[in-house]
Amino acid sequence: MQIILLEKVANLGQLGDVVKVKDGYARNFLIPSGKAKRATEANLQAFEARRAELEAKQAEILVDAQARGEKLNGVTITIAQKAGVDGRLFGSITNADIAEAIIASGVQVQKSDVRLPNGPFKAIGEYNVEVALHHDVVVEIQLVVNAEA
């Protein structure tokens, strides 16, 4: 299926690109989430009429993400969790826990912005965590997991 991208999509293209994707990906994800529209003549003309507006909106989102990235760059987040004698946690630290701690420090993030490629943390220690605020803005923060007293 041919679609018009309404915003930058990772591994697919930029705003305004007409790309061919599998039907299910377009119907079940891209179109319902507002990231794309079918590439019909009417939609192409409507997109060209709104192109400047969409580009301005995307630029505003990028500037906001960069501002939040500046606040987060180099920040150390500390989370206390119950742990056993050997340093293993009872439970784990997930991206939702980390996002909650970042929000408590004063920067708005979604839990989906926190990247944990190796899964949740299950031991006390210091970890580097990537926070992807935008496709072009990825910030690394320091996470310290302590045993709760």
Curated annotation (Swiss-Prot):
It comes from the Bacteria. Keywords: Ribonucleoprotein, Ribosomal protein, RNA-binding, rRNA-binding. InterPro entries: Ribosomal_bL9, Ribosomal_bL9/RNase_H1_N, Ribosomal_bL9_bac/chp, Ribosomal_bL9_C, Ribosomal_bL9_C_sf, Ribosomal_bL9_N, Ribosomal_bL9_N_sf. Transmembrane segments: none annotated. GO terms for molecular function: rRNA binding; structural constituent of ribosome. One of its GO terms (cellular component) is ribosome. One of its GO terms (biological process) is translation. The keyword RNA-binding applies. Belongs to the bacterial ribosomal protein bL9 family. Binds to the 23S rRNA. This is Large ribosomal subunit protein bL9. It comes from Laribacter hongkongensis (strain HLHK9). The lineage of its organism: Bacteria, Pseudomonadati, Pseudomonadota, Betaproteobacteria, Neisseriales. The gene is rplI.
